[in-house]
Amino acid sequence: SVGFKAGVKDYKLTYYTPDYQTKDTDILAAFRVTPQPGVPPEEAGAAVAAESSTGTWTTVWTDGLTSLDRYKGRCYHIEPVAGEESQFIAYVAYPLDLFEEGSVTNMFTSIVGNVFGFKALRALRLEDLRIPNAYVKTFQGPPHGIQVERDKLNKYGRPLLGCTIKPKLGLSAKNYGRAVYECLRGGLDFTKDDENVNSQPFMRWRDRFLFCAEALYKAQAETGEIKGHYLNATAGTCEEMIKRAVFARELGVPIVMHDYLTGGFTANTSLAHYCRDNGLLLHIHRAMHAVIDRQKNHGMHFRVLAKALRLSGGDHIHSGTVVGKLEGEREITLGFVDLLRDDFVEKDRSRGIYFTQDWVSLPGVLPVASGGIHVWHMPALTEIFGDDSVLQFGGGTLGHPWGNAPGAVANRVALEACVQARNEGRDLASEGNQIIREASKWSPELAAACEVWKE
């Protein structure tokens, strides 16, 4: 007789192990599982563990050539989701040996590569990942991190201010550079290429880089502050992307930008390594994230994409506003903002954090609040995000009735007023509007902005 029993397998026999003690080196995942009617949660959870690690649908003779116990993923705990019918959180532990060192790409291919189309599941969402210290240490992480960025820019004790140049498509390079100059001269720290500004017929990348560099040197000379413009290096090939980053470095600018989800983690990690080697800061835009993270019961939560970015590398990342035009619940957002900035984050289910995460001194990432925010939001933003953040006002700068530079002045005055008020011990949550009103008495630019965007 054959040495193994052929036939289709019951996953839960092998892959559901409720008494498993997780190891410090395991990668842990929390999945929100919605099984098909009639499929027990243990079977569904086990199926996820199997399908995202060593499993295949039937017994194969080559199983005898390896030690399943050493390499298999294990579903070690299942809990029902409160208030949801037939939804469960399945916790899966993966042995570290299943993953290539320093590759976010491989980590995702393994954990979420195949299993989301699985027939026994109606829906599946990856809510959180615990990356073990041993695996974190195989990544370079952000090119510079929060402290080094502050030192490079010589800006301390306040959030940084940015602005996306609009209209995002259609300006010539020279006019684009002019818009950049106006904003920076008015008092912003950064301006930004829109995520879909790459190298189109109306404005080729090299021309844009040149005029933006000219704009920021001029603004630096006039204001005595260090200025930056996020030059979008995203391109159709990795080689072209690096070529753009090299040109940015040759121009002597401080920062470049990348769309990390559309560009891909492999490209992003290459760019992050280049940026560290060459002293460039790296701003990350999350274009395409909502395709992955918007559905509540299927896909991947943004906190997982944020953790992945910290491993892959980036100094800034867009992370929702809590107050503007795009959705994002406050506690949940603050949860992944901490995951980006802090060195050690405690498990806290009320903030969506399923696992305690130790980043073992990997540099932090500045969260960027951007999308539909204006001067009246400034007190709330200062309070919610604190000093280590970038506040980005696109329309909230360029929509100023007097133009870009006065729009920038209004934002800078509002920010400085909020920071000063906070440092004097005032409560931004309750006195915010009053603080802005008081400041607007001294700044006609701010007064005009307050008029345009009523509270």
From Swiss-Prot:
Residues binding substrate, per UniProt: 114, 164, 168, 286, 318, 370
Active site, renumbered: 166 (proton acceptor), 285 (proton acceptor)
Names of required cofactors: Mg(2+)
Any GO CC annotation of this UniProt entry: chloroplast
A GO BP entry: photorespiration
MF GO annotations: magnesium ion binding; monooxygenase activity; ribulose-bisphosphate carboxylase activity
Bound cofactor: record note: Binds 1 Mg(2+) ion per subunit.
Highest taxon in the source lineage: Eukaryota
The EC number(s) this enzyme carries: 4.1.1.39
Post-translational events: The disulfide bond which can form in the large chain dimeric partners within the hexadecamer appears to be associated with oxidative stress and protein turnover.
CDD domains: RuBisCO_large_I (cd08212)
Record localization: Plastid, Chloroplast
NCBIfam families associated with the record: PRK04208.1
Subunit structure comment from the entry: Heterohexadecamer of 8 large chains and 8 small chains; disulfide-linked. The disulfide link is formed within the large subunit homodimers.
Record's protein name: Ribulose bisphosphate carboxylase large chain
Species of provenance: Lupinus albescens
